[in-house]
Amino acid sequence: MVKEFLGEGSQAGQNLLRLVSRGNAIIAELLRLSAHIPSVFKLEDRNEARKYQDILLDFKYLSNPDFYESKIEENADLVDLETEFRDNHIDILIRFYHLFESIYKYIMDLEHYIVDVEKGFYIHLTIEAILINGDGKQLLSEAVYLYGVMLILMDNLIEGPVRERMLISYLRNKGPVDLPLIDEVCKLCKSTGYIPGSPKKPPNYPEEYFRRVELPENVISMIVGRLRSDDLYNGTESFPQPEHRSVALSTQACMIYVILYFIPDILNNKNSIMREIVDKFFPDNWVISFFLGFTIDLSVAWEPYKAAKTAMGNTIIQSNIQYQTQRFWKEVSELNKLVDDLLVDGLLVEEYIVDNVHKIITTLRRCNVTIRWVMLHSNASQKKFKDLVLMGGSQEDVLYLLLNTAQLEFVFKNIFQQLLATKEEKWEENKKLASDSMVELSEYFSGEKALTRVKKNENLQKWFGEISQKISQLDSTDSTSTGRKIQQLSLALEEVEQFQQIDSSIQVKQFLIETRQFLTKMIKIVNIKEEVLVNLSVCADMSYAWEIVNNYVDQMQKGIKSDPKCVLKLRATFLKLVSILDLPLVRIAQCSSPDLISVSEYYSGELVGYVRKVLEIVPKQMFLILKQIINMQTNNIQEMPTKVEKERLRDFAQLDQRYDLARATHSVSVFTEGILAMETTLVGIIEVDPKQLLEDGIRKELVLQIALAMDKTLIFSGKPYQAPSNKQQQQEIELLQRLKELSNILDGFRRSFQYIQDYVNIQGLKIWQEEFSRIVNFYVEQECNSFLKKKVYDWQSQYQSVAIPIPKFPSQSDQNSQQSVNMIGRLARELLNQTNCKTTLYLNQIGWFDPSSGKELVGINTWSILHQSVGIFGLTGLDKLFSFMMVKDLQVFVSQTRSLVEKSLKGFLNEFEDYLRPTTNIPDTMIRYQQALDKTKLLYPIFIDVLTKIGQIQLIRRQISNQLNFHCKIDSNMLFSSLDIMNKSLLNDIESHFQRPDSNPYPSDDNTLLFDLAQYLDTAGINDPFTKIYITTSPLEQFPCLLFLFVLSQVSKFQFNSKLNVMSSKKQKNSYDWTPFIIGCITILQQFHSLHTQKFLAFVGQYIKSHINIALANPKENNKDDADYPEDVIGLLRFLEDFCKYSHTSRKIVEGYVPPYIFDYYNN
């Protein structure tokens, strides 16, 4: 049974294999999640730490949970903050908890497995028996080793305090009822006090950490004993030379390093065992990769342990370090020359490789051992040791050796695989040729063949016939006996040449020589075995370099800069790095685990990310040259007119400038040639297409350049226009200056990108449109996050990409930008700043201008330049951001108003409304109006600020909509017409639905037509921002009356400006703009039922009629010489006229509350 430990019927073997497979999958998830720890849990940012310190608790919460819960519950702000925090982070918290729980379950399952084996659950099987079996000792050692790796990686990649905050956050949100293992998981994940990267470690770390969930010590001791004595993975077959023994046993060395922490007594007290371990595994190395490139310096790690430190003394003595350094750096220089000689064009052909398999494999083995030692020890933790190693030679030589070794491996593998594929064919071909030669010689000595003129020799005839039969019977499957037989046959043929009858015949001798050559080829062919490639893949393993290889990115990029064709060698290096995937995937694949795909995708994705990182230098260099092209096209080369006079042709030739442009263009194409020359490469399970790789790199660099240009350009002083001094005039036009500057930069990029697209084989304008829209939408999304309870994080955003990331910039700290996350927010707030209702006046015909100087601040020209600079995507993004701002203001305003009415004004307003009812009657006196105004006057400052800001935003959105509408008609009239017709058709359908709901049903919930069409309509500017519903509100019956009183209190503060044909503020101080005021009122009324608007108009109409009635009854009291109507009546009539104009309310509706003759008299 032990012999078939991994057989299908072996439950013990299959269970252990599944456990090890699960361990590898858990580690992949740990690595994946550790890269996505929300920054808030680290509390590195002071503002975040201050904000969340009361709800982000560590394990101190467990000592007195009631105290902390009551503290949160008593504070409404903390309750809201926690709700928001939970909504944003619960998904990632669930994944982290499942990870921590999986680690604990893995440990418990491993412990249960060991207990089951010891109790005899698996018949005739013991721990000792498992450790005797080849597969058994590998799997059991790996299972314990992976447990240790999980603990080390968890403490290094997810710091203790972070783990505690995550667990407590998850516990408080889920409750202990659903979490049966929470106590055990908390015990395992409790902070160890260790800070990654810190030279100081807590006392007894990590052995105390490893002891939190203990495994049987006797089992660990047996595993360590097996690791000490056996070659578990038969590494010496791939590394037969004695000087390579430490590399041959390197996998075991990593395992024994980790497992020793489970029995620290060996590290502390067992001098003889530690000396044996060091002599066997670490005689010439002290820096190891214990898992996928995570390195450890044993001179530091084993410093606290007496026996281990003593044992390592001989290895880290300076003389030994100097000797090993000199030895390996000498190997670097020798091997570079040797590999260069092997890579000479035309040398590595099938015949040469067949003849020199052993020589090439030996060379590659030496190369890999040397690269491994130098790379690892160049990464030593102790500076004095690291300096000694680095002094030995240049890292460029190491990289050169790595590239050439990878190229040699790549070429050798390809040719050797072809030889394996054609092995049988060539074997049969040479066997037939050799056999036929013997048959011909046999016939030759028969003396019967025409023209032979040779004396018949029956013995030779018979002998050659027998040799022919023996050759025909040779079998390539048994290489050992076949090789011996071929040698005997070859020797026999050599001896037969001595016969006089043969020696005298040149023709026969030639036949014999050729036959021996065929036999020699057959010996070489029979030695072409799969084992050669298996051993080579073991030697070429680079799992130790998962992290270290990042140190060579800059040097690789320098190589590409100086020689773009160097990319071809890099392809072989990338393929060599794929060997990294073998270690974590081999067991998962072996048990056909469903985790194989997700784990493969993760590791392959990380490798592809590295490939992109190395090759991104190509688009970087391309964009450096592109900047020169932009400068030439923008400043040096004149644009050719449609028609030009013959005499002026020479002026437009600009031969020198065009030569410089051509040279720069050629440089770009040369840079891209290298990548495009690469073949499609399979990196793990991800296919890397060089053309796509180049395009992604270009996209990434384009995104970076556009984002940088926008971030650097869209920075504003944040000061509103005040007075027309020279300095302030510069501030006044700052917005236009910035927009023009950005427009010029982006236009230069766009033109040059369009120019260069054919030379690098890409669709330039398509890429430009896609990436620019993604950039703007991402920054708008991030800016809108501040208005959302449930945030959209980078990794959740549909616009963010791992391969083509959009950069994030720190927020600007100036006065205007303090609330802005990025440049889109700064631009939006600068527009609000320049159109401030307190300092500007809005006219429909021109936009916003300064009333004191008459200077236009934001007009038609501004929107045109804004379109040129940020495009359609920028305009729609700004519109979306302004919508979010307005919705936030509307929600806060309605909530505050409702709260104030419920608290103190509800009774009074109900009483006042009762007095006014019915609104068709005229009240007896105006005193009640004044009393109501006095009662509610404290609300008016809040109302005027909020409503004018809402109106201001709505006016800006209307201007954006007009700009989008205009450009859609010009640039895409067919699309505009189609959308317009579709919109009208749908409106008709909706209308008919309300008229006959039974025969014309409303679309079902899963029909997204209205939602999808609305997005197109907004982008095309076919909308009316003023009449939209932005928030859902419950009825607030007193609101129409309250809004009426507010409007009544404000209209008297405005007067009609006959020159501008608009109402303007009487006082310059604390003044507001008329148009935003009206539009703010329209917008707020649209958020309620239409009955609210009717009630509001009824109150206004009643007041106008009653006031006119009183004024006409007492003409002496009306002190206006130029009008029969009182001042506030005139203001209200103006208000109603503009209300109808902006809200598209029918005049007939208003005339139902205010008789038309009143308007006619007022207008005349």
Swiss-Prot record:
Task: Share an example GO biological-process annotation for this protein.
Answer: endosome organization
Q: Could you describe the subunit structure of this protein?
A: Probable component of the WASH complex.
The record ties this protein, via InterPro entries, to: WASH_strumpellin
The protein depicted here goes by the name: WASH complex subunit 5
Q: Name one GO molecular function term.
A: identical protein binding
**Spans through the membrane:** none
Family listed? Belongs to the strumpellin family.
GO CC, sorted alphabetically, is: cytoplasm; endosome; phagolysosome membrane; WASH complex
